[in-house]
């Protein structure tokens, strides 16, 4: 794969997360009845970063949970069949019933991972609402799923791959588009 372009650098990611944190606070009139749930792997770290920013702004901690969704196939490459994401587990340290749950992921693409996450959340409890925050929306939805909070819209072709790198996992913060050779 060849790197085509860097879309967000460390500073741009920080700015996007700060803006999303402010949007969440404004939309929810504070964050008292909200729980952030990150989709493994990078969504968890983004959720934790958002919780830190919200706490800095509001002065109150935000509960952060995580959900592990594994794909039977590589959802970022060509589709080979109707295989679906598989929920491997959820670690949510609070009851989500009657809470606003904000699912956090790095890239929104087909929408299948988010749908699997929503199914898993409804199995755990009955949230009053489920919202979605993503760092990157690259389009190409296969399901009627739309993010409530978006760091950056990046129109891509299906042949391109959007890669999010976060310092907690990848030792650097960057979002880049790669082209398959």
UniProtKB/Swiss-Prot annotation:
Claim: Transcription regulation is one of the keywords in the record: yes
EC assignment: 2.4.2.9
InterPro entries cross-referenced by the UniProt entry: PRibTrfase_dom, PRTase-like, PyrR, PyrR_bifunctional
GO molecular function: RNA binding; uracil phosphoribosyltransferase activity
GO BP of this protein: DNA-templated transcription termination
Keywords assigned: Glycosyltransferase, RNA-binding, Transcription, Transcription regulation, Transcription termination, Transferase
Residue positions of motif PRPP-binding: 101-113
Pfam families registered for this protein in UniProt: Pribosyltran (PF00156)
Reactions performed catalytically: UMP + diphosphate = 5-phospho-alpha-D-ribose 1-diphosphate + uracil
SUPFAM superfamilies: PRTase-like
Self-association and partners: Homodimer and homohexamer; in equilibrium.
Family: Belongs to the purine/pyrimidine phosphoribosyltransferase family. PyrR subfamily.
Biological role stated in the UniProt entry: Regulates transcriptional attenuation of the pyrimidine nucleotide (pyr) operon by binding in a uridine-dependent manner to specific sites on pyr mRNA. This disrupts an antiterminator hairpin in the RNA and favors formation of a downstream transcription terminator, leading to a reduced expression of downstream genes. Also displays a weak uracil phosphoribosyltransferase activity which is not physiologically significant.
Listed name of the protein: Bifunctional protein PyrR
Organism taxonomic ancestry: Bacteria, Bacillati, Bacillota, Bacilli, Bacillales
